[in-house]
């Protein structure tokens, strides 16, 4: 195939751990490894690169199933959340998928329980445990006797830390049963001492926020261009 300049697709299946089943030689013999991710109950699919000998693996493709088959998704952010009335336990953030900025809704449910448990869908469980420990230590919020459930809307899996502040906001909102304005976004990474750290591509994220008609931004550092948003700068929680 190589001598004839023919492209060959090798399709395999994935184990429960998320790796390619079978011997590793399958990965080594090819130039590109792509994972097609997505919940079967949702229309969106994400094509993500894990190996590319000829370019970057940081880019993603987002597709949706339509009557014409699988097509490239337009206005992607609007498919990951809905801007209805304000409800407790909901906060918005902007994440980066490759070079794309996406508006994402973080949903939290906190309820008292005799046998508390934590569950996270689309957000790393270990990072959730760290954020809950920060809330107990720094803000003295007694979450030890509460169930905490986190969900990232749209079936997105967050692989960066810029959503930390939004997760914290959603948890506090649910715990106090006080809604957060749908016009606000939260962008920031939290350190172990509660400091809110600067994040990359802030200007691009704020540009996406303006596109989605957000009005307020809670961020850790001053951007080059606020994009007309009212920015609040937070150094720690």
Where do the model's predicted regions map?
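Peripheral, non-AAA+ core regions of ATP-driven protein-machinery
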Residues: 1-24, 28-237
């Amino acid at each position: 195939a190589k001598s004839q300049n023919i492209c060959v697709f090798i399709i395999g299946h994935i184990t429960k751990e998320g790796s390619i089943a079978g011997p590793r030689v399958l990965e080594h013999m090819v130039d590109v490894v792509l994972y097609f991710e997505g919940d079967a109950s949702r229309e969106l699919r994400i094509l993500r690169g894990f190996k590319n000998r000829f370019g970057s693996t940081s880019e993603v493709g987002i597709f949706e199933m339509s009557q014409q088959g699988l097509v490239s998704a337009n206005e992607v952010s609007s498919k990951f959340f809905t801007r209805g009335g304000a409800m407790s336990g909901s906060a918005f953030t902007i994440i980066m998928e490759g070079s794309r900025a996406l508006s994402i809704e973080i949903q939290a449910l906190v309820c008292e329980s005799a046998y508390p448990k934590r569950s996270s869908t689309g957000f790393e469980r270990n990072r959730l445990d760290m954020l809950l420990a920060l809330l107990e230590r720094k803000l003295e919020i007694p979450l030890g006797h509460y169930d905490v459930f986190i969900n990232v809307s749209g079936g997105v899996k967050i692989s960066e830390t810029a959503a930390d502040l939004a997760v914290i906001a959603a948890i506090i909102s649910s715990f106090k049963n006080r809604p957060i304005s749908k016009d606000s976004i939260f962008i920031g990474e939290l350190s172990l001492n509660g400091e809110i750290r600067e994040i990359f591509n802030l200007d691009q994220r704020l540009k996406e926020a303006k596109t989605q008609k957000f009005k307020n931004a809670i961020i850790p550092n001053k951007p080059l261009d606020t994009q007309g948003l009212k920015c609040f700068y937070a150094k720690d929680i």
